[in-house]
Amino acid sequence: MLCLPVFIILLLLASPAASNPLEKRIQSDLIRAALEDADTKNDPRLLDYVTGACCAGLNFVCCGKK
């Protein structure tokens, strides 16, 4: 009868200590995705298109051209 409370206490202590494999996998996926995103570079054609559209819409104010 005395072993039951000890077993329950040990069970309660051990359950939060167990790691969640899904949580670890999600964390590793997020880290890997962040590293892959850090390696990517912007396409200069896309940047030229965006700045061109911005400058055309604002009469070349943002580009410094007149």
From Swiss-Prot:
The record's account of how the chain is modified after translation: Contains 2 disulfide bonds that can be either 'C1-C3, C2-C4' or 'C1-C4, C2-C3', since these disulfide connectivities have been observed for conotoxins with cysteine framework V (for examples, see AC P0DQQ7 and AC P81755).
Molecular function GO labels: toxin activity
Chain residues in the propeptide: 20-45
Major place of residence: secreted
Localisation per UniProt entry: Secreted
InterPro entries: T-conotoxin
Domain of life: Eukaryota
Record-level GO cellular component terms: extracellular region
Protein name (record): Conotoxin PnMLCL-01
